[in-house]
């Protein structure tokens, strides 16, 4: 068991290092630069009156941003997450926590979040579990993960490509729809379904809408590509390493995934992430109909430096979003929906 935990910790450390490598970014597939908003030369509004308030789980939120789930369960995670949570406490951003998988078998692992929760009790946090773990985990155990963290909701991460390439991957997803439907019916918290960089098709989104999930974070192609990351880790396994290269461009991009979701007029909230680099990219997702936008790599890079750098990054993103709104004549986020170039 100890060896298993050591392997888990090493994998999480590897992920941080590899996620920052340019070769593991699918920037060449990023769709945002090919999508424009309509410029308004005479915006009839005052910049200071612009509001970026949004709705999350049918309640108003001051900021429409979330730091996407990134890291937990290793020695470097505490400092990274402390900086992220401190910044969130000052800006009212929400945050998805790193994997809580280890907490299912190691009761001590939950204590990683205890001091952070004590120091930053008002931060809106989202629990994190992979779809493969959901299948075999009692709902009561999942509820404990949420309760221990005092989380607002649960994010279920879907990562079939990553699991195929990862040397330690879990590739048995059989029963995932049945488990997900049972979770949505029985859990006391909102359930969010999130991809990890490969996006969603219309058919999958329709099924998710039918079972009643609270939100879908589309997380499409255009940013960190986990197939490429695991390909680096599998460099001594010729089959997985070659497969990673074959699938290096696999997935549905973030803008198309968002369009797929919005076209259904779903009952779930549409969240946008995957290659979102700045506030202008965020504005484009809001223009398509997203209500929350997630950032990962820009925040990880900042958190490796300092809390101050995270705050600076957040402030820049917010100002860029407001600038996009001002230059399209949009006082509130909903106004952006009329400003997408045809």
From Swiss-Prot:
GO biological process: isoprenoid biosynthetic process
Binding site for substrate: 11-12, 99-101, 162
CDD domains: IDI-2_FMN
Residues the entry annotates as binding Mg(2+): 163
Localization per Swiss-Prot or TrEMBL: Cytoplasm
UniProt keyword Flavoprotein present: yes
Any single GO CC term annotated in Swiss-Prot or TrEMBL for this entry: cytoplasm
Keyword Ligase: no
EC number: 5.3.3.2
Keywords, alphabetical: Cytoplasm, Flavoprotein, FMN, Isomerase, Isoprene biosynthesis, Magnesium, Metal-binding, NADP
Domain of life: Bacteria
Record: residues binding FMN: 68-71, 99, 128, 194, 219, 224, 275-277, 296-297
Cofactor: FMN; NADPH; Mg(2+)
Protein function: Involved in the biosynthesis of isoprenoids. Catalyzes the 1,3-allylic rearrangement of the homoallylic substrate isopentenyl (IPP) to its allylic isomer, dimethylallyl diphosphate (DMAPP).
Family affiliation: Belongs to the IPP isomerase type 2 family.
Protein name according to UniProt: Isopentenyl-diphosphate delta-isomerase
Species annotation: Legionella pneumophila (strain Paris)
């Amino acid at each position: 068991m100890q060896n298993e935990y050591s392997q888990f910790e090493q994998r999480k450390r590897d992920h941080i290092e590899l996620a920052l490598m340019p070769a593991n970014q699918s920037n060449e597939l990023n769709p945002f630069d090919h999508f424009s908003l309509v410029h308004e030369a005479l915006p009839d509004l005052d910049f200071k009156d612009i509001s970026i308030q949004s709705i999350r789980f049918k309640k108003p939120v001051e900021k429409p941003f979330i730091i996407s789930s990134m890291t937990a369960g290793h020695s470097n995670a505490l400092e990274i997450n402390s900086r992220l949570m401190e910044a969130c406490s000052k800006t009212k951003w929400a945050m998805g926590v790193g994997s809580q998988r280890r907490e299912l078998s190691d009761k001590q692992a939950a204590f990683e979040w205890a001091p952070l929760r004590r120091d930053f009790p008002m931060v809106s946090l989202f629990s994190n579990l992979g779809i493969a773990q959901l299948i075999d985990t009692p709902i009561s155990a999942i509820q404990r993960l949420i309760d221990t963290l005092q989380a607002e909701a649960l994010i279920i991460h879907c990562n079939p490509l990553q699991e195929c390439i990862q040397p330690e991957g879990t590739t048995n997803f059989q029963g995932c729809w049945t488990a997900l439907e049972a979770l949505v019916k029985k859990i006391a918290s909102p359930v969010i379904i999130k991809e990890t960089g490969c996006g969603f098709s219309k058919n999958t989104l329709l099924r998710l809408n039918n079972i009643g999930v609270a939100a879908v974070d589309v997380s499409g192609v255009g940013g960190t590509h986990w197939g490429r990351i695991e390909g680096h880790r599998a460099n001594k396994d010729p089959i997985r390493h070659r497969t990673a290269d074959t699938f290096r461009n696999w997935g549905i991009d973030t803008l198309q995934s968002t369009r797929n979701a919005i076209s259904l007029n779903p009952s779930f909230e549409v969240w946008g992430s995957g290659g979102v680099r700045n506030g202008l990219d965020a504005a484009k997702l809001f223009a398509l109909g997203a209500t929350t936008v997630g950032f990962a790599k820009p925040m990880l890079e900042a958190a490796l430096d300092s809390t101050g750098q995270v705050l600076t990054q957040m402030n820049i993103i917010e100002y860029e979003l407001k600038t996009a709104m001002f230059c399209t004549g949009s006082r509130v986020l909903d106004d952006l929906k009329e400003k997408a170039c045809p």
